[in-house]
Amino acid sequence: HENHSPVGAFKIRGGLTFFDALRQQGALPRAVISATRGNHGQSVAWAARSHGVRCTIVVPHGNSVEKNAAMRALGAELVEHGDDFQASREHALALAGQTGALMVPSFDLRLVRGVATCWWEFLRAVPQLDVAYVPIGLGSGICGAIAARRALNHPVRIVGVVSSHATSY
């Protein structure tokens, strides 16, 4: 179960594959930065700490107290900025430019590769699955599902879903 991973979500697979790819290329940065509301930040913080890399996570004001505490507990420096994810993201990009930290977007291909492993396992375990309804969010989950489906030549129909109340970017 993904909820039994160290961060309680599939996102950790993305963070670990992202940092492993950098390590294999001899390109581990001194510091990374990202914007998130939670699980992506936990993934990046966990993987950064595992690789001895400083991590800053930018979250919007009013973000989940529990998610913020979890990211801090994993070693991330937390910066609260803006009223929504987009404002946090823009601030993270500006900080990356000022500090030289590597920006880690949640939809980076190296992250999606890790997320796809979850779908790879699931689709292999359920070959008769007809349809999977997948939250779109910022894209790593649904892109991982599609990548795994294509790699396995699985017939499942992937349907992206989003709340009618979700902010659009």
Model-derived regions: residue spans:
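PLP-dependent amino-acid enzyme catalytic core
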Residues: 1-169
